[in-house]
Amino acid sequence: MKRNYVLMLITVIISLIFIPYSVSANEGDVDFSIQALIPENQIDKKKTYFDLKMKPEQKQDIQLQVFNSSSKKITIEMDVTFATTNQNGLIDYTISDISKADESLRIPLPEITNISNREVVLQPGQSKIVTITITMPEEEYDGVILGAVHFKRN
C-alpha cells in the first residue's frame, strides 16, 4: 500500500514537471500605434526612439505619428514622464509623482517639455502628427535626461 502511494506521488510530480501547460494574456484593445519621426540631431538614426544631442537653451519640436487602426473614433491622451529606477535597479517609465522623485534628479523631462494639445481625436484609419516642444535649461548638462511619452486611450 505504501509502495503504491509513493509510486502515485512520483507519477504526479513527474506529470507536473513534464506536461506542458499554456498561459495566455489578453493585450486588450490596442487599436492605435505610435511612430517617432526621427529628427536630424538624432545621435543614432537607426533607433526608433528619440536620442537627441541638444545644447543649452536649445528649443526643439519632436514629432510622433499616431495612427488609429480601429473601426471606431478614438481619443488618445498624452503625457510626458521622467524615468526612475525600480526596486530591481531597472529603468521604470511608469507615470510617477514628480514631488516624490529622488533628489539626484536634476532635470525632470516633464519640466522641459510642453505638449500643446494633450488629447488627440482620431477617426477610423486616420493618423495625426503630434508635437512636443523640448526647451533645454540654460546651464550645460553633461548627462542624459531620460523619460517617456505615455499614450492612453480614453
PLM region spans:
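Long beta-sheet-rich domains in secretory-pathway and surface-associated proteins
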Residues: S24-N154
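Sec-dependent N-terminal signal peptides of Gram-positive bacterial secreted proteins and lipoproteins
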Residues: K2-A25
